[in-house]
């Protein structure tokens, strides 16, 4: 696992955008995440696109997850969110931006179809991830199998509470979602996880330095042959081997 510590959230966004842009310019398949953390990275990519530095015209994208019961046109669906935050502002082909079918009549069949669609596309080249305060990635809550596939899950009460800021009130937040499983996520060729802020420090420490455990779904990154974790100083505050990570970053072979 490669741990990159940057001074500020803005620096994290730039570093993540560097990696994503390098893939986009080779017409790669990108795994995209929603939520508040990736927004700055998407803004950086939009700015680079406007300057002619990156193109997504040859890329396709798969989202990590989607709320159960929300149609793509619902303003809080993750498909609508990723269009609002990113893909509609660059030259992505809308037809090549896919999300799990949250409004499907048969959600279980929809999850299996989503896994198959990723396989049919040749897999994901780079998967952008965030991490929740309880260690979840995607909607893989604590106790999720480390080999799980795309499936329907019940959301942890803390996740419902955290996501209520995007809705008018707590009651409107869906209690279930369709999410790529930890096994599905781990099949991406490169995992890129970003985290900022003191509220993520415990989760980052557990993911990087804690035991491999379903209690911290993010710890599955420990098993991946190419995982990059980019955090700001606040999110890195509890890392015991922080000085080594800084040294390794400064002495990387390019």
Curated annotation (Swiss-Prot):
CDD domains: GlcN6P_deaminase. Keywords: Carbohydrate metabolism, Hydrolase. Pfam families: Glucosamine_iso. The active site is at residues 65, 134, 136, 141. It is an enzyme of class 3 (hydrolase). Pathway: Amino-sugar metabolism; N-acetylneuraminate degradation; D-fructose 6-phosphate from N-acetylneuraminate: step 5/5. One of its GO terms (cellular component) is cytoplasm. InterPro entries: Glc/Gal-6P_isomerase, Glucosamine6P_isomerase, Glucosamine6P_isomerase_CS, NagB/RpiA_transferase-like. Its EC number is 3.5.99.6. It comes from the Bacteria. One of its GO terms (molecular function) is glucosamine-6-phosphate deaminase activity. One of its GO terms (biological process) is N-acetylneuraminate catabolic process. It catalyses: alpha-D-glucosamine 6-phosphate + H2O = beta-D-fructose 6-phosphate + NH4(+). Catalyzes the reversible isomerization-deamination of glucosamine 6-phosphate (GlcN6P) to form fructose 6-phosphate (Fru6P) and ammonium ion. NCBIfam families: nagB. PANTHER family: GLUCOSAMINE-6-PHOSPHATE ISOMERASE. Belongs to the glucosamine/galactosamine-6-phosphate isomerase family. NagB subfamily. This is Glucosamine-6-phosphate deaminase. It comes from Corynebacterium aurimucosum (strain ATCC 700975 / DSM 44827 / CIP 107346 / CN-1) (Corynebacterium nigricans). The gene is nagB.
């Amino acid at each position: 696992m490669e741990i990159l510590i940057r001074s500020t959230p803005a620096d994290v966004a730039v570093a993540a955008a560097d990696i994503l842009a390098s893939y986009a310019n080779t017409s790669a398949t990108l795994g995209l995440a929603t939520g508040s953390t990736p927004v700055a990275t998407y803004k950086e990519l939009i700015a680079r696109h406007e300057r002619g530095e990156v193109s997504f015209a040859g890329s396709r994208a798969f989202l990590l997850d989607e709320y159960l019961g929300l149609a793509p046109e619902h303003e809080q669906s993750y498909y609508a969110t990723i269009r609002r935050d990113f893909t509609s502002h660059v030259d992505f082909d809308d037809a090549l931006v896919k999300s799990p079918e949250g409004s499907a009549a048969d959600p279980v069949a929809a999850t299996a179809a989503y896994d198959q669609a990723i396989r049919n596309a040749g897999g994901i080249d780079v998967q952008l991830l965030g991490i929740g305060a309880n260690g979840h990635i995607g909607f893989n809550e604590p106790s999720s199998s480390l080999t799980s596939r795309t499936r329907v899950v019940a959301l942890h009460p803390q996740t419902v509470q955290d996501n209520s800021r995007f809705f008018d009130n707590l009651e409107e937040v869906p209690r279930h979602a369709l999410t790529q499983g930890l096994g599905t996520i781990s099949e991406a060729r490169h995992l890129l996880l970003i985290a900022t802020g003191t509220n993520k420090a415990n989760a980052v420490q557990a993911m990087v330095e804690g035991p491999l455990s379903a209690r911290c779904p993010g710890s599955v990154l420990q098993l991946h042959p190419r995982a990059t974790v980019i955090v700001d100083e606040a999110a890195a505050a509890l890392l015991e081997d922080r000085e080594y990570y800084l040294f390794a970053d400064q002495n990387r072979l390019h």
